[in-house]
């Protein structure tokens, strides 16, 4: 962290080690191996293929530097979402800490741990987007942090999608933050 080693990180034990994983951008998450927030999100969908046509991928981010979030608040949201027709992303560091993804519960021993930010990812069919957005709006005011939401879909062969008109009908103002052009490729697998 410090080029002259004047500041050295302390060795942390469980459950405090969770704080470093979610708060230190140079430490990779053990569950995913990804640095920063521990997930590639849908930014790399052209390579990962996590979200297909007719589907929507959500990123629900909790906390920010200066605000933070406790896992207890994240659990309120994951439990609120779990009963909907969604699937939590398994390649996500918060998913790795869920004791029961079916109910959205998170490990009891980390609920009071506070981190700078964390992202929950999920996927659903496009027709369920309004229901997911309504649930996020319902639960978010109960949390002692801020919540940011992103939603993405895969465009069709003409570059169009059904998500934009759906969001407009629901009254959401949005900006197309990133468009994958399909230039990314999966890494080649070495053959013997």
Q: What is each stretch, according to the model?
A:
Residues 122-129:
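Helix N-cap motif at beta-to-alpha junctions
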Residues 8-12, 85-95, 145-152:
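Flexible, glycine/charged-enriched surface loops at secondary-structure junctions
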Residues 1-15:
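Iron-sulfur cluster-binding cysteine motifs and their immediate structural context
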Residues 115-122:
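Short, well-ordered beta-strand segments in beta-rich or mixed alpha/beta enzyme
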Residues 64-72:
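Short, surface-exposed ligand-recognition loops at beta-strand->loop->(often short) alpha-helix junctions
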Residues 55-64, 118:
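Short glycine-/aliphatic-rich beta-strand segments at the starts of folded cytosolic domains
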Residues 63-65, 93-94:
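Histidine- and/or cysteine-centered catalytic micro-motif in compact active-site loops
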Residues 17-55, 73, 78-83, 98, ...:
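Long, contiguous binding/interaction regions
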């Amino acid at each position: 962290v410090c080029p002259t080693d004047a500041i050295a990180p302390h060795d942390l034990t469980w459950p405090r080690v969770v704080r470093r994983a979610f708060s230190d951008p140079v430490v990779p998450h053990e569950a995913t191996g990804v640095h920063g927030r521990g997930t590639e999100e849908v930014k790399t969908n052209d390579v990962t293929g996590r979200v297909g046509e007719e589907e929507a991928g959500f990123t629900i981010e909790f906390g920010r530097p200066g605000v933070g979030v406790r896992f207890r608040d994240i659990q309120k949201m994951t439990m609120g979402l779990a009963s909907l027709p969604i699937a939590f992303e398994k390649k996500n560091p918060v998913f790795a800490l869920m004791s029961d993804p079916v109910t959205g519960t998170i490990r009891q021993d980390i609920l009071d741990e506070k981190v700078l930010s964390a992202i929950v990812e999920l996927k659903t069919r496009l027709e369920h987007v309004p229901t997911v957005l309504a649930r996020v709006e319902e639960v978010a005011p109960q949390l002692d942090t801020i919540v940011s939401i992103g939603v993405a879909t895969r465009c069709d062969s003409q570059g169009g999608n059904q998500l934009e008109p759906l969001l407009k009908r629901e009254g959401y103002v949005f900006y197309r933050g990133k468009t994958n052009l399909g230039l990314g490729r999966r890494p080649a697998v070495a053959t013997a």
